């Protein structure tokens, strides 16, 4: 018996829907709404843009979890541990193209161009991240930041870029978006290795098990070139809690967490200055303040 289009759609989207029902922070949606303080995009267009950004973000998480061999996402089993890798890859790719289909409904000649450019950026950043990890090549801090701007900046840039197509506000927001992109990713890196809440939601220090070069580990590796401890731990892809606790202790001792916190504080105040220079934005400031609590409270 021929399956109806609706049934097929349901089967294809099941892994994606599974991820959607997990509790998320909705940071991207809040960010778009905050930027609308300046951009004043019509509500119907804004809703489509928010939907597209969320679709792409969530689809990229499905793929991320496969590429990173993750066990948990938001404290629940990753989609591919339930549905299998082939179904999840297909589901995520399907959602990318549903996102493209939605972008077409915006009816703007530049929308697809922007979509394509930002998705290429996203994949370039992601590809570099994986390459460094799997070839045991530690990037410099500058190389890492450039990669982050492609990876996190890809979707940030898409949301705000699409919004600007429907706005009279034409000021260049890229410098601010870059600051926010770095802030979000470095905060995430810090949380993965240092925050209690994160270790309850993801397996403890998952970035170490994954072998990922993140902001604190890159600092530790370059600031102590005579020691190869961190590289060796990352190379092992270890799930051993004691080794991971030792690594966190080492990062603390060589000042990598302090360096990361200071970098985050600098990015935070840089963002406030950039926001002020554009006439202020209370919603955006409130969002950044909320996200900054994590690396301040912990250490007080």
UniProtKB/Swiss-Prot annotation:
Annotated GO CC locations: cytoplasm; cytosol; nucleoplasm; perinuclear region of cytoplasm; Z disc
Annotated residues for binding of Mg(2+) 2: 64, 68
Pathway, per record: Isoprenoid biosynthesis; farnesyl diphosphate biosynthesis; farnesyl diphosphate from geranyl diphosphate and isopentenyl diphosphate: step 1/1; Isoprenoid biosynthesis; geranyl diphosphate biosynthesis; geranyl diphosphate from dimethylallyl diphosphate and isopentenyl diphosphate: step 1/1; Isoprenoid biosynthesis; geranylgeranyl diphosphate biosynthesis; geranylgeranyl diphosphate from farnesyl diphosphate and isopentenyl diphosphate: step 1/1
Cofactor binding remark: Binds 2 Mg(2+) ions per subunit.
Domain of life: Eukaryota
GO molecular function terms noted in the UniProt entry: (2E,6E)-farnesyl diphosphate synthase activity; dimethylallyltranstransferase activity; geranylgeranyl diphosphate synthase activity; identical protein binding; metal ion binding
Main location: cytoplasm
EC numbers on record: 2.5.1.-, 2.5.1.1, 2.5.1.29, 2.5.1.10
UniProt-annotated binding residues for Mg(2+) 1: 64, 68
Binding-site list for dimethylallyl diphosphate: 73, 151-152, 185, 202, 212
GO biological process: farnesyl diphosphate biosynthetic process; geranyl diphosphate biosynthetic process; geranylgeranyl diphosphate biosynthetic process; isoprenoid biosynthetic process; isoprenoid metabolic process
Cofactor(s) named in the record: Mg(2+)
Assigned keywords, A-Z: Acetylation, Cytoplasm, Isoprene biosynthesis, Lipid metabolism, Magnesium, Metal-binding, Transferase
Entry-annotated residues carrying N-acetylmethionine: 1
Pfam families associated with the record: polyprenyl_synt
InterPro entries registered for this protein in UniProt: Isoprenoid_synthase_dom_sf, Polyprenyl_synt, Polyprenyl_synt_CS
Xref: CDD domains: Trans_IPPS_HT (cd00685)
Ligand binding (isopentenyl diphosphate): 25, 28, 57, 74
Recorded family membership: Belongs to the FPP/GGPP synthase family.
Subunit structure: Homohexamer; trimer of homodimers.
Function statement: Catalyzes the trans-addition of the three molecules of IPP onto DMAPP to form geranylgeranyl pyrophosphate, an important precursor of carotenoids and geranylated proteins.
Protein name per the record: Geranylgeranyl pyrophosphate synthase
Organism expressing this protein natively: Bos taurus (Bovine)
Gene expressing this chain: GGPS1
């Amino acid at each position: 018996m021929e399956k109806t289009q609706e049934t097929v759609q349901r089967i294809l989207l099941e892994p994606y829907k599974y991820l959607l029902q997990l509790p998320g922070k909705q940071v991207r949606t809040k960010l778009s709404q905050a930027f609308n303080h300046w951009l004043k995009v019509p509500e119907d267009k804004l809703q489509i843009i928010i939907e597209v950004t969320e679709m792409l973000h969530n689809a990229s998480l499905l793929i991320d979890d496969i590429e990173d061999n993750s066990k948990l996402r938001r404290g629940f089993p990753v989609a591919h541990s339930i549905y299998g890798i082939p179904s999840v890859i297909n589901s995520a790719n399907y959602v990318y193209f549903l996102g493209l289909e939605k972008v077409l409904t915006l009816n703007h000649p530049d929308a697809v161009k922007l979509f394509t450019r930002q998705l290429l950026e996203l994949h370039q950043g992601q590809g570099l991240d994986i390459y460094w990890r799997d070839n045991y090549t530690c990037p410099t801090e500058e190389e890492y930041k450039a990669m982050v701007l492609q990876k996190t900046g890809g979707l940030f840039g898409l949301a705000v870029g699409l919004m600007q197509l429907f706005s009279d506000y034409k000021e260049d927001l890229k410098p601010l978006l870059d600051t926010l992109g770095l802030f979000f990713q470095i905060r995430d890196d810090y949380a993965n290795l240092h925050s209690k809440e994160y270790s309850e939601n993801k397996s403890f220090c998952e970035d170490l098990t994954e072998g990922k070069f993140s902001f604190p580990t890159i600092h530790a590796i370059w600031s102590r070139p005579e020691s190869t401890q961190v590289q060796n731990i990352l190379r092992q892809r270890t799930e051993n809690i004691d080794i991971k606790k030792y690594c966190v202790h080492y990062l603390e001792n060589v000042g990598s967490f302090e360096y990361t916190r200071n970098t985050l504080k600098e990015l935070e105040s840089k963002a406030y200055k950039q926001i002020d220079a554009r006439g202020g934005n209370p919603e955006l400031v409130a969002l950044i303040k909320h996200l900054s609590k994590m690396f301040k409270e912990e250490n007080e």
